[in-house]
Amino acid sequence: MSTDALITVKDLVKSYGQLHALNGVSTEIKKGEVVVIIGPSGSGKSTFLRSLNLLEVPSSGQIIFEGADITDPKVDINKHRQKMGMVFQQFNLFPHLTILKNMTLAPMKLLKKSKAEAEAKAMELLKRVGLEDRANAYPSQLSGGQKQRIAIVRALCMEPDVILFDEPTSALDPEMGGEVLDVMKALAKSGMTMIIVTHEMGFAKEAATRVIFMDQGKMIEENTPQEFFTNPKTDRCKNFLNSIL
């Protein structure tokens, strides 16, 4: 195990009865990496991502996050989750709260920030994504692209060390998806550690430091975007890329 790994995954297995959604997955994520995970439906990509903060509890294996074994039942997972932002396909904003309250709730409750401090940080982040004028709107008054940009900056309000993205643009049309990808590219350039399950190959080529291809619960191939897309090593990966590019 590298000493500079932010997350180390060892022999991760997730079974649902006879089905192995994850089949002995091992990898390391270093600070500042932008790791894009691709693969066909049912390959285990989202299960892997959701296992990293124990939204899916692995059947066996180990996840070390910032030196702590978070698969140990004695560990306070909520403490570690505060350092792992998560952005979902369906935004998961609280519908009954304004955008500003969506963004300040967790920092005030969990990080014990004052209302003024939490609101100042939220407004600064809203400005970064061009949505400061929507602070007092409710989620139902926003477009899908706006909601997802809010979901990203809401995650940033908690000052996480890594953000996990589970198909963040798959519920959006290409134009709205483009708005979200622009925010993610800027975030990648800022040095944020990001792990992203996506079908957006253009984003993977442009912003990823590493691309991982998963199939049947295993990591089949991983490489830099340049090597991965121009010179895939396995037939399975070649066939997948040929079918989508």
Region annotations inferred by a language model:
Residues 4-225:
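ABC family nucleotide-binding domain
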Residues 213-216, 222, 226-245:
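C-terminal boundary and immediately downstream tail of ABC-type ATPase nucleotide-binding domains
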